[in-house]
UniProtKB/Swiss-Prot annotation:
GO terms for cellular component: bacterial-type flagellum basal body, distal rod, P ring; outer membrane-bounded periplasmic space. GO terms for biological process: bacterial-type flagellum-dependent cell motility. Residues 1-24 form the signal peptide. This is Flagellar P-ring protein. GO terms for molecular function: structural molecule activity. InterPro entries: Flag_FlgI. PANTHER family: FLAGELLAR P-RING PERIPLASMIC PROTEIN FLGI, FLAGELLAR P-RING PROTEIN. The basal body constitutes a major portion of the flagellar organelle and consists of four rings (L,P,S, and M) mounted on a central rod.
Amino acid sequence: MNSIFRKIVFAAFLLLALPQFALAVRIKDIAAFDGVRENQLIGYGLVVGLNGTGDSDQTKFPVQSLVNTLERMGITINRADITVKNVAAVMVTAALPPFAKQGNSLDVLVSSVGDSKSLAGGTLLMTPLKGADSQIYAVAQGGVLTNSFSYGGQAASVQKNHPTAGRVPGGALVERELPNVLAGRSQLRLNLHQPDFTTASRVAAVINNKFKMTVASLTDPGSVQLAIPDDYQGKTVEFVAALERLEVTPDVMARVVLNERTGTIVIGENVRISTVAVSHGNLTLYVKETPRVSQPAPFSSTGETKVVPRTSIKVTEDRGSLAILQQGANIGDVVRALNALGVTPRDLIGIMQAIKAAGALNAELMVI
């Protein structure tokens, strides 16, 4: 099974290693205009209608929240008479997209903050959602979808997915609009998602070539300053639409990304390796415990029965193979050579780190 998995993994690497041509992409896919971004919203609310899976009586703040809600509706009740097994206190979060208009709907995330067991089947009561400036920008309410369940008895339980968090699709309505950051501006700034000197220079060149004048200028590798032409003054939306459709070929750094927790390796197309020899061998340690019982002779008055440990250890080391990677080897050469050694993805992580330590990996090595 491990052999089949190893072959599948390295077959995928070989497919990635096939010769590829750098593709031009739209500016809108690699950059964003300054100020055009999402804003985070948050609120505190109650989910009701739970089938006994709400917060326990030991969690005090849901009871107080429910009392306050009922009092605002003109219902007076003694706090000691309330149990909240069908109610759960939750934090509600949402992302307010740029240019969202009053009345637009947003998806919201609902997460339990108490000790409730499940939010499945519950209904989120009206919850104001505030921004970082403490202003209310949306109000959320609706049925909670969890796509999960949790059932149990005294001796066993079963759970699917995460029942204490869910979504309310389209559950929030925008009540306050964000200011239009593009209106009335004579200059804009384009921020690259991945700052790079070469990519920024190419973006500026493509824009200037489009408008046949100096519209874009470089300030740093992460941004391009734009002066709106006279023909587009008061027509910022048209200017942005014409600009973001332009195509440019981005440049990327040679990079190898390793995730030691999952054994994932991602190798960029531009990675090159200097001449280096790689040897890889496997060490297998086999330990077996075989305890034995030692008993005294029959009718003995002084002896006692004891358990005597017996341990056997066997160490086997596979014969290491040697692969030579020539100078300028690309990702395809690397994968083919290491595949010949029979390495696993986790072995490849250690090999890449060793090649980098030897000074032969001409790329950035990023461990996440």
